[in-house]
Curated annotation (Swiss-Prot):
Described function: Scaffold protein in the commander complex that is essential for endosomal recycling of transmembrane cargos; the commander complex is composed of the CCC subcomplex and the retriever subcomplex. May modulate activity of cullin-RING E3 ubiquitin ligase (CRL) complexes. May down-regulate activation of NF-kappa-B. Modulates Na(+) transport in epithelial cells by regulation of apical cell surface expression of amiloride-sensitive sodium channel (ENaC) subunits.
Descriptive protein name: COMM domain-containing protein 9
Highest taxon of source: Eukaryota
Assigned keywords, A-Z: Acetylation, Cytoplasmic vesicle, Ion transport, Nucleus, Sodium, Sodium transport, Transcription, Transcription regulation, Transport, Ubl conjugation pathway
Organism: Bos taurus (Bovine)
GO-annotated cellular components: cytoplasmic vesicle; nucleus
Sequence positions bearing N-acetylalanine: 2
InterPro entries linked: COMM, COMMD9, COMMD9_N
Encoding gene per record: COMMD9
Family from the record: Belongs to the COMM domain-containing protein 9 family.
Length: 198
């Protein structure tokens, strides 16, 4: 994620017009969300609370959004690391206030970002049963044991629209396929253990 530009830092100076620290805190909190950038309501609140034009409010909200996202993206959790984002000539008191606010909220923002990120489908539930499948070929009829694997898969809700985000998938596995799959899963488990122990 790219660092903030000089224009972003210039836009942040509009926060000096805030009547209290709580106004700055509220704007920081509300501007983190991606949906905040298109929010007419937040834009109007920013205009009225800071007495700025719509264009200035929009630039400020974009700058706050980038600043808070950058702190989360870079996993900044110390005052020194956050202060280093600002240029030397940035207003000292505002720099300290923004740093304090970011430190207060960075954990919650990180959790929110993880929840809202677009992700691969997730396995929610797994069940299985063993059945005997009657098979016939040209030589003889025979009973073949098979495993029916029933999985509940959760898609990313933001990508599903009106469709339900959880779907059922049933897979039939022969003994040979199951052996191959279990062998592969065993290797995956060993690799995950090796990575986790580093």
């Amino acid at each position: 994620m790219a660092a903030l530009t000089a224009e972003n830092f210039a836009a942040l100076q509009s926060l000096l017009k805030a009547s209290s620290k709580d106004v700055v805190r509220q704007l920081c909190q509300e501007s983190f969300s991606s949906s905040a950038l298109g929010s007419k309501n937040l834009l109007d609140v920013t205009c009225s609370s800071l007495s700025v034009t719509q264009e200035e409010a929009e630039q400020l909200l974009q700058a706050l959004h980038r600043l808070t996202r950058l702190a989360v993206f870079r996993d900044l959790s110390s005052a020194e690391a956050i202060l280093a984002l600002f240029p030397e000539n940035f207003h000292q008191n505002l720099k300290n206030l923004l740093t304090k606010i970011i430190l207060e909220h960075v954990s919650a923002w990180r959790a929110e970002a993880q929840v809202n990120q677009i992700s691969l489908p997730r396995l929610v539930d797994l069940d299985w049963r063993v059945d005997i499948k009657t098979s016939s070929d040209s030589i003889s009829r025979m009973a073949v044991p098979t495993c029916l694997l029933q999985m509940k898969i959760q898609e990313d809700p933001s990508l599903c629209g009106d469709r339900p985000s959880v779907s059922d998938v049933t897979v039939e596995l022969s003994k040979e396929t199951l052996d191959t799959m279990l062998d592969g899963l065993g290797r995956i488990r060993d690799q995950l253990s090796a990575v986790a122990s580093k």
